[in-house]
A protein has these predicted regions:
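Bacterial N-terminal signal peptides that target proteins for export
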Residues: 2-13
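Bacterial N-terminal signal peptides
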Residues: 12-21
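Glycan-recognition patch characteristic of GH18 chitinases/ENGases
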Residues: 30-131, 158, 167, 234, ...
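Substrate-binding surface in catalytic domains of secreted glycosidases
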Residues: 39, 69-81, 146-307
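Conserved, mostly hydrophobic/aromatic
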Residues: 59, 100, 141, 170, ...
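Active-site groove signature of glycoside hydrolases
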Residues: 127-157
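Acidic/aromatic/glycine-rich contiguous surface patches that form carbohydrate-binding/processing clefts
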Residues: 276, 339-381
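Hydrophobic, secondary-structure "cap" segments at the distal end of domains
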Residues: 297-355
Length: 381
């Protein structure tokens, strides 16, 4: 326990070798139960050498894009073969469902595709044709910035209403295709989105669009990043002792979704298999919620386990209130916020306790020996 600002705070300390032991390989679990979804985003540019299909219920393959004609396409010709290899995992887990995620960071084309009834229908028909051609099980839309001028993508004020209409049209076409293709029950074509909080809600009709979706993948991460003024837990479950009133966290995001009337079983909580580093950090509170000089970079968990968590130069702290770990290098003034098995188990308990629909993560190749995936799968029992 540490003393700070005259208050006793629940932050524990684990150094070097002990932190390394804490991140050790867990026992191989049984598959996750059917009532909870365990969803892996798999990136086409970073395909894992092996995938434990029996530990997953769904895979979202990233990314397809929207071309200049408003149609769903793979920009990289290698992605078709990558998707085929994911679909082959059904031989080991027949209940596995593989969706194609359309969009992503800096993905353009959504505003135009959603603009008119004609463009929406063209997009929906192309999505159905794309699924049929590749024998995939559904579409996940990752339109991260409807109605917002972020990442240089085209946007319009009417994106807010048009997104709902786009999902409605897509749902209708997917349902018609399910009927035509004799896909029933769990085999029907799925439709999901990646959702966020705060500004995302201001520019979408979350209280209306969710009726067209099978579920929503809440991006419960990136709360602190290169655009925030201070460090903080980028994937904290709750607010830290030192958090400002407006700081973001996963619980607040879930509550915002619930307040919009979205059924809790439709909410899938996302976790991050990577950390974020900040350099030149003010040393107060061991770097937590402090100003910094520059954003240092992203850190996949697999690389962190070997190079950072096990390093004598870093001290691992556990923030009990936020249910989040972080690393602090006092000499280098380097702060790293990340997820580990302990924080993921805490989120899995939260999912169970709140009756949510499961967990997803970005992205599978950033794990090490299934350490984080095992924390999810074992905790979903």
């Amino acid at each position: 326990m540490l003393e700070s600002l005259g208050k006793r705070i629940a932050i524990s300390v684990v150094t070097g070798a002990l932190a390394c032991l804490a991140s050790g390989k867990a026992a191989v679990p049984a598959p996750a139960p059917e009532e909870f979804r365990v969803i892996a985003y798999v990136a086409g540019w970073s395909m894992p050498a092996t995938i434990s299909a029996e530990k997953l219920t769904h895979i979202n393959f990233a990314f397809a894009r929207i071309d200049g004609n408003g149609r769903v396409v793979f920009e990289d010709p290698r992605y078709a073969a990558a998707l085929k290899s994911l679909l082959a995992l059904k031989q080991r887990n027949p209940r596995l469902r593989v969706l194609v995620s359309v969009g992503g960071w800096q993905a353009d084309g959504f505003s135009d595709a959603a603009l008119t009834a004609e463009s929406r229908n063209k997009f929906a028909l192309s999505a159905v044709a794309f699924l049929r051609a590749h024998r995939a099980d559904g579409i996940d839309l990752d339109w991260e910035y409807p109605g917002q001028g972020v990442a240089g993508i085209k946007f319009r004020a009417e994106d807010k209403q048009n997104f709902t209409l786009l999902l409605k049209t897509l749902r209708e076409q997917l349902d018609a295709a399910s009927d035509a293709d004799d896909r029933s029950g769990p085999d029907r074509y799925l439709l999901t989105i990646a959702s966020a909080d705060r500004e995302y809600f201001e520019h979408t009709e979350m209280d209306r669009l969710h009726v067209h979706l099978d579920w929503l993948n809440i991006m419960g991460y990136d709360f602190f990043n290169s655009l925030t003024e201070t460090t903080g837990h980028h994937a904290g479950l709750h607010a830290s002792e030192f958090a400002a009133p407006g700081d973001r966290n996963a619980d607040a995001s879930v509550r915002q979704h619930l307040a919009a009337g979205i059924p809790r079983e439709k909410l899938v909580l996302g976790v991050a298999f990577y950390g974020r580093g900040f350099a030149g950090v003010n040393p107060a509170n061991n770097g937590l919620h402090q100003p910094y000089e520059r954003y240092e970079g992203d850190h996949p968990y697999g690389g962190m386990s070997d190079l950072l968590i096990c390093s004598e130069n870093f001290v691992r702290y556990w923030d009990e209130r936020a249910s989040a770990p972080y690393l602090w290098n006092a000499e280098a003034r380097l702060f790293i916020t990340y997820e580990d098995p302990q924080s993921i188990r805490a989120k899995a308990k939260y999912v169970r306790d709140h009756g949510l629909g499961g967990m997803m993560f970005w992205e599978l190749s950033q794990d090490r020996n299934d350490e984080l995936l095992d924390a999810i799968a074992t905790s979903m029992h």
